[in-house]
UniProtKB/Swiss-Prot annotation:
It is an enzyme of class 2 (transferase). The gene is fmt. The lineage of its organism: Bacteria, Fusobacteriati, Fusobacteriota, Fusobacteriia, Fusobacteriales. PANTHER family: METHIONYL-TRNA FORMYLTRANSFERASE (PTHR11138), METHIONYL-TRNA FORMYLTRANSFERASE, MITOCHONDRIAL (PTHR11138:SF5). It comes from Fusobacterium nucleatum subsp. nucleatum (strain ATCC 25586 / DSM 15643 / BCRC 10681 / CIP 101130 / JCM 8532 / KCTC 2640 / LMG 13131 / VPI 4355). This is Methionyl-tRNA formyltransferase. GO terms for biological process: conversion of methionyl-tRNA to N-formyl-methionyl-tRNA. Attaches a formyl group to the free amino group of methionyl-tRNA(fMet). The formyl group appears to play a dual role in the initiator identity of N-formylmethionyl-tRNA by promoting its recognition by IF2 and preventing the misappropriation of this tRNA by the elongation apparatus. The keyword rRNA processing does not apply. Gene3D superfamilies: 3.40.50.12230. Belongs to the Fmt family.
Amino acid sequence: MKIIFMGTPTFAVPSLEKIYKEHEIISVFTKVDKPNARGKKINYSPIKEFALANNLKIYQPENFKDNTLIEEIRNMQADLIVVVAYGKILPKEVIDIPKYGVINLHSSLLPRFRGAAPINAAIINGDTKSGISIMYVEEELDAGDVILQEETEISDEDTFLSLHDRLKDMGADLLLKAIELIKKGEVKAQKQDKKLVTFVKPFRKEDCKIDWTKTSREIFNFIRGMNPIPTAFSNLNGTIIKIYETKINDKVYNNATCGEVVEYLKGKGIVVKTSDGSLIISSAKPENKKQMSGVDLINGKFLKIGEKLC
C-alpha cells in the first residue's frame, strides 16, 4: 500500500520501521525541529532521523491551513495515512483524502484514556492492564471506530518507561495487522462505548508534585507513572527533589505527619510517612545533584529525619 506516515517521538519509530519494510512510504510528516535546552543545536525528531537515513520525503508543517499543502497531499494519491504520536490534530480536509482513510495507533484500551499521556495515566490510576488500540481517525479526538486492540498486564515493577517500550513494539506489530485487514477489506471495526470514555490532559509541572496525604499505594503508583517522564517531585527546604523509585513499607508511624522523613533503613533507603503507612525512597535526585540510590541519599544526608517533603 502507498502510505503517508505521521509521527514524531521514539514511540513511533518501530511502527515506521515495520511499515517501511512492507509497504511504500510516500512521505513522512513530523513536528518542526526544536533547539536543545541550551538553544545552540537543533534537535531532529526520532522520526525525522529515520526518514533522513532512509531518504524519505519529509514534511514539517506548523499546521494544515495551507491549501497548497492540502493539494500536495491529495496529489500523493495515498491509499492510507498512518498516525502514531504525531502531536497534531488533522482537519477533515486531510482525513478525507486517502482511499482507505486515516488510522491512528493509540496507547490505551479505548475508550479509556483518550487524549494525551495515556501510558502515564494507566499506571497512576492503578490499572492492572493497558494496551494498544488501532482506530480510524475522526474529527473528534480519539473517538474513531476501533479496528484492533491488544492488551498487556501492568505489574508493580512497571514504570512509564517499561510500559512505553512494551507498547511501542506491540503497537508496531498490531499496526501491520490492521493495515493488512484494510488491504484485504476484512476490517470489522467496533464503535467506542461513549459511557466508558475517560480523558487524560497533558501534564503541567504542578501536576507532577507528590501529595503525601494520599495512601502509600496511590503515591507509589503516581511515582512509577511519572518515571522517568515527566518525573514526580517534592519540595524540600525550598529546593526540588525528584523521586523516581519507591517501595511500599508496612510500618506505620502514628506520631509523624504526612511527608515527614521518619527513618533510615540500612541498605534500602529513606522512609517517608503517608496517610496510611509509609514509603521507602529508593531512587531520587536532589536539586543540582545526580540521580542516586536511597542508600546514597542517607550517606549524603540529603534528607534528615524530621524534615518534611511537601
